[in-house]
Amino acid sequence: MVNMKASMFLALAGLVLLFVVCYASESEEKEFSNELLSSVLAVDDNSKGEERECLEIFKACNPSNDQCCKSSKLVCSRKTRWCKYQIGK
């Protein structure tokens, strides 16, 4: 009977220890994911402040001063005054 009480106590202590280890591991993962998300958002916020050298698709433009991104094959449409994709050239 003493062995059974001791084994039950050890089993219960093992379960408590397993719970504590899992809880600590989970909280570390949450902290890591929160830090990762914060760093990604910080990088995104920094890039918003910088101006691009050229305009992206569907951005308003001036046909006489075409600043649409040439690397993306964009041109300023005289009709709509937006940067659009140039097909065929």
Swiss-Prot record:
Changing residue 66 to A: Important decrease in ability to inhibit both Nav1.2/SCN2A and Nav1.7/SCN9A. Its main location: secreted. Changing residue 58 to A: Important decrease in ability to inhibit Nav1.2/SCN2A, and small decrease in ability to inhibit Nav1.7/SCN9A. The modification Pyrrolidone carboxylic acid (Glu) is found at residue 53. The modification Isoleucine amide is found at residue 87. The presence of a 'disulfide through disulfide knot' structurally defines this protein as a knottin. Shows a weak or no inhibition on rNav1.4/SCN4A (IC(50)=3.9->10 uM) and hNav1.5/SCN5A sodium channels (IC(50)=>10-25 uM). This toxin has also been shown to weakly inhibit Kv11.1/KCNH2/ERG1, Kv1.2/KCNA2 and Kv1.3/KCNA3. This is Huwentoxin-IV. Two forms of huwentoxin-IV exist in the venom of H.schmidti, a non-N-terminally modified (HwTx-IV) and a naturally modified peptide with pyroglutamic acid residue at position 53 (mHwTx-IV). mHwTx-IV shows no observable difference with the unmodified toxin when applied to the TTX-S sodium channel of DRG neuron (IC(50)~50 nM) or when tested on hNav1.7/SCN9A (IC(50)=30.8 nM). In addition, similarly to the unmodified toxin, mHwTx-IV has only a weak affinity for lipid membranes. The record marks 58, 78-79, 82, 84 as: Binds to the extracellular loop of voltage sensor domain II of sodium channels (Nav1.2/SCN2A and Nav1.7/SCN9A). Changing residue 84 to A: Almost complete loss in ability to inhibit both Nav1.2/SCN2A and Nav1.7/SCN9A. Disulfide bonds join 54-69, 61-76, 68-83. It comes from the Eukaryota. This lethal neurotoxin (without cyclization at position 53) inhibits neuronal voltage-gated sodium channel Nav1.2/SCN2A (IC(50)=10-150 nM), rNav1.3/SCN3A (IC(50)=338 nM), Nav1.6/SCN8A (IC(50)=117 nM), and hNav1.7/SCN9A (IC(50)=9.6-33 nM). It inhibits activation of sodium channel by trapping the voltage sensor of domain II (DIIS4) in the closed configuration. The toxin neither shifts the Nav1.7/SCN9A activation curve nor modifies the slope factor. It does not slow fast-inactivation of hNav1.7/SCN9A channels. In addition, it has only a weak affinity for lipid membranes. Residues 25-52 form a propeptide. InterPro entries: Huwentoxin-1, Huwentoxin_CS1. Pfam families: Toxin_12 (PF07740). One of its GO terms (cellular component) is extracellular region. Changing residue 63 to A: Important decrease in ability to inhibit both Nav1.2/SCN2A and Nav1.7/SCN9A. GO terms for molecular function: ion channel inhibitor activity; sodium channel regulator activity; toxin activity. Belongs to the neurotoxin 10 (Hwtx-1) family. 22 (Htx-4) subfamily.
